[in-house]
Amino acid sequence: MMAESAAGPTAPVGKDRILLGLNTFGDVGEQPDGSPQPHAEVLRQLLEQAELADAVGLHAFGVGEHHRKDYAVSAPEVFLAAAAARTRQIRLGSAVTVLSSDDPIRVFQRFSTVDAISNGRAEVMLGRGSFVESFPLFGFDLADYEVLFEEKLELFDQVRAQKPVHWEGRTRPALHGLSVYPPLEHHLLPTWIGVGGTPESVLRCAQYGYPIIFAIIGGQPRGFRPLADLYREAVAKYGHPMQQVATHSPGHVAPTDEEAREEFFPHWLKLRNRLGAERGWGPAGRPEFDALCAPEGALYVGSPETVARKIALLKRNLGVDRFDLKYSNGPLPHSAMMRSIELMGTAVAPKVAELLAG
């Protein structure tokens, strides 16, 4: 494994700052007659959303890989290359790339290409996949879920070091002294590991010295403090420079708390109960939603003031360096998402900075 430099795009930002990003899976909306929105239209609207996020000064924009009818993004790097040509400053990444069902060499090559097009703004988030449609689609056995990720992460780490690769494993043919192109121009590819909350995943990320992002979609974010502490302790134990700790949670910003909740709730409920039916969860309702919107809950829904206070509380409770809002949730309309993005940059971000400076 190649060590990170102490400075760089994923170095910790300090106790009085937090970076704000956005991510989306390209949730498929509804047309006026209730039929699903065409996937192509969703992708074109995503480009408008990325442009706006850049224009209002947000730090990062990520798109998550899925292979199902309710999400439009199946090839994050293709979208990110298009977004790179239409943005100037914002970092562009996946959220996440399902490494287990992909080729680590091709993942690196695609992101190094995006990095070149964007002049050094690419990053990749790697995950095992909480959705598993890619495994049968690409011919992988779910029984190999663990070994696929472990071996492919090991290979990716070697490729990322930009030296000749020597690797052997069970999941693909061996490599002996081969080089991978194109290399990155300015730095190693910023590489995150997305985790759902198991100590094993946290320790694996720390072993590689990669920054970590926790997907917090329920309960109370402060409950992740032991895992954040475990990560920091393990990074130090492995002798790596400290890296950023981030979280990802769903949410929506509108001018008032009432407007944000009433606008967001029906779309959140559709998504929550659709996924819940697939995963054996019980049905959700308004009480669960309101609890998640409370100050200690995992939904960042409300006015700019409310959302900013929740993000500042997250910073104090977990010491995170970055917060990514999953701003698309179910069939939430494009116009509502655009307003939410604008408010995140123009109202939430300055309020968070004010709260953390005080």
Task: Annotate each language-model stretch with its function.
Residues L20-T24, F61-V63, L92-S94, A122-L126, ...:
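Hydrophobic faces of well-ordered beta-strands that scaffold small-molecule active sites
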Residues M2-D16, L22, E146-S179, P221-D321, ...:
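An alpha-helical appendage that flanks or caps ligand/catalytic pockets
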Residues L20, A53, G57, E65, ...:
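Conserved, mostly hydrophobic/aromatic
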